[in-house]
């Protein structure tokens, strides 16, 4: 099914060609003056230069050929040379009937599906998720869902920080606390226990303690570095301990990500890249890309067109140790080997842009990826508190993500309870109220984040995000629940709309709702192409507003003409379907009632 804009452009282009002008001038866009028209074409302005003719004369020529077409209710040529277009109500209704019959609501699947890996999440094992992890998880999940909806094969990878000094620190601290553990006995040859010798809460306390000690005590740090070295060389007891650290951490991380409705196809980490580092570095040297500089192995990645200096990409330190660059490049190696992706998207803090420029250029220069492989850096801004500074706890520390979710849940539960009392509607059980609060809280957090362009910083304002009015997640959910309520009421009266179709609009507000719905396919294509979930948010806010205007101006349930009422119900069903599809792409759902 073609996008509505494409259909209109095709008709206007045909008129340009019939009038003797090139087809490139027939492009139609949404009107930037909705008070005057719905769509516009400015092609006559550009054609005037080429044909040395007054633009209004060209616009008049084209308008004359469009007059009387079934597609348009009105076609106006406006000086100095604009074409103002309004669709006919019948044509628009026909387009919506097609949309409703199409399970994808007019958003065509790509004809050329790609394999895309989205790298997001970036959690570290043995550490709790904090608010700094929110944006990567929320944006990455939405990018994954959008890309899948367009028809691509998408693989989400959490890319865990599970290798390096933090592991040595934990092993060293465990050895100090529990030296009797069999993992530290090098002579031991038996099977290691299946159960971990620590819980997640112990693990989360061990790491910061060990980290603090290593900063004060040089011998302790040396022991941690030695433990890291032995782990990476494959010492049996340390590998067994490391596996316990991983399984305990991942189980907890999955619980946390589940509460955000975020999931990953791969739970790979830096450790998975480790076996590829030595052969990769060797190949880079052999091919003449990598060379020694001040004892370190580096690859030049600067280009003539650079406005500022791009330093070389370091592959190995002077002591032969690897860095984040090394791990990220080796990760590209195994991803290309195992999954042959056409594109890799990294959802990370925008402050890492220079770093990823180095990594991507190095990967291209050394042939780790094919020339046509896409490498995309989707950098996000900071989530700030009301003071405009990075979000902190009242004590000034970094807030755990779990605590943030709980505080928004509590705020939503309070609002739901107050609403129930105000309405004297005590039908909702405590259990349902809690579940509903959880769903709305998640929408508040995710929509609050995703409605901002990813690269922009934003202020996390709990009062604004949890409001049922304005451009918020709860407002969108309230709109969906309102539609569900009307549909339930209609069906509870024993009425049935089967066989009915969406008719031509009976009012301006109904037409506005229909126009908003018709833009779904074009919006989705644009949001995917620009990797921009905020475009979905803008669209559903506009759609929710259009529906609520229609709802307030139309007596849906008391409409006496049964055919018109059925048409309204069909229109509501389509609105609900499109809104629900969109919020699913953003990563949240609507409750049955609020």
Name each region found by the language model.
Residues 91-106:
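Secondary-structure boundary elements
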């Amino acid at each position: 099914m073609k996008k509505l804009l494409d259909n209109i452009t095709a008709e206007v282009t045909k008129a340009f060609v019939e009038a003797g002008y090139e087809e490139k001038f027939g492009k139609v866009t949404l009107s930037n003056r909705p008070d005057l028209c719905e769509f516009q074409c400015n092609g006559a302005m550009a054609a005037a230069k080429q044909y040395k003719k007054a633009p209004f004369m060209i616009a008049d020529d084209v308008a004359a050929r469009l007059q009387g077409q079934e597609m348009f209710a009105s076609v106006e040529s406006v000086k100095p040379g604009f074409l103002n277009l309004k669709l006919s109500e019948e044509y628009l209704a026909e387009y919506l009937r097609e949309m409703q019959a199409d399970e994808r609501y007019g958003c065509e699947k790509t004809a050329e599906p790609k394999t895309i890996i989205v790298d997001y999440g970036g959690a570290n094992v043995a550490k709790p998720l904090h608010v700094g992890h929110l944006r990567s998880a929320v944006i990455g999940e939405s990018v994954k869902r959008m890309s899948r909806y367009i028809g691509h094969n998408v693989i989400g990878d959490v890319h865990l920080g599970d290798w390096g000094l933090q592991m040595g620190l934990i092993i060293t601290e465990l050895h100090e606390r529990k030296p009797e553990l069999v993992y530290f006995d090098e002579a031991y040859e038996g099977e290691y226990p299946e159960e971990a010798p620590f819980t997640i809460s112990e693990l989360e306390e061990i790491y910061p303690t060990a980290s603090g000690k290593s900063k004060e005590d040089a011998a302790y740090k040396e022991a941690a570095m030695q433990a890291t070295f032995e782990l990476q060389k494959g010492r049996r007891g340390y590998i067994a301990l490391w596996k316990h650290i991983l399984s305990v951490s991942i189980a907890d991380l999955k619980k946390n990500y589940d509460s955000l409705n975020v999931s990953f196809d791969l739970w790979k980490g830096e450790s998975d890249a480790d076996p590829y580092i030595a052969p990769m570095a060797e190949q880079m040297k052999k091919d003449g890309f990598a060379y020694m500089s001040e004892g370190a192995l580096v690859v030049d990645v600067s280009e003539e067109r650079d406005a500022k200096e791009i330093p070389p990409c370091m592959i190995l330190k002077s002591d032969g140790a690897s860095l984040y660059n090394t791990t990220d490049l080796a990760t590209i190696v195994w991803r290309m080997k195992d999954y042959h992706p056409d594109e890799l998207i990294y959802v990370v803090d925008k402050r890492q842009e220079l770093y990823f420029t180095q990594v991507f250029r190095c990967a291209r220069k050394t042939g780790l990826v094919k020339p046509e492989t896409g490498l995309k850096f989707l950098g996000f801004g900071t989530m700030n508190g009301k003071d405009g500074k990075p979000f902190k706890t009242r004590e000034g520390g970094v807030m755990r993500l779990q605590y943030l979710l709980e505080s928004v849940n509590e705020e939503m539960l309070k609002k739901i309870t107050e609403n129930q009392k105000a309405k004297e509607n005590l039908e909702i059980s405590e259990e349902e109220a809690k579940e509903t609060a959880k769903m709305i809280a998640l929408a508040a957090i995710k929509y609050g984040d995703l409605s901002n362009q990813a690269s922009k910083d934003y202020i996390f304002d709990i009062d604004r995000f949890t409001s049922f009015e304005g451009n918020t997640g709860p407002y969108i959910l309230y709109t969906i629940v309102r539609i569900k309520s009307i549909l339930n009421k209609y069906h509870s009266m024993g009425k049935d709309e089967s066989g009915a179709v969406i008719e031509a609009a009976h009012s301006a507000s109904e037409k506005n709702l229909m126009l908003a719905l018709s833009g779904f396919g074009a919006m989705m294509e644009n949001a995917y192409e620009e990797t921009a979930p905020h475009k979905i948010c803008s669209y559903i806010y506009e759609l929710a507003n259009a529906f609520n205007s229609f709802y307030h101006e139309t007596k849906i349930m008391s409409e006496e003409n049964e055919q018109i009422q059925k048409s309204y119900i069909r229109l509501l069903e389509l609105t609900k379907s499109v809104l629900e599809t969109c919020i699913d792409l953003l990563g949240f759902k609507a409750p049955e009632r609020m």
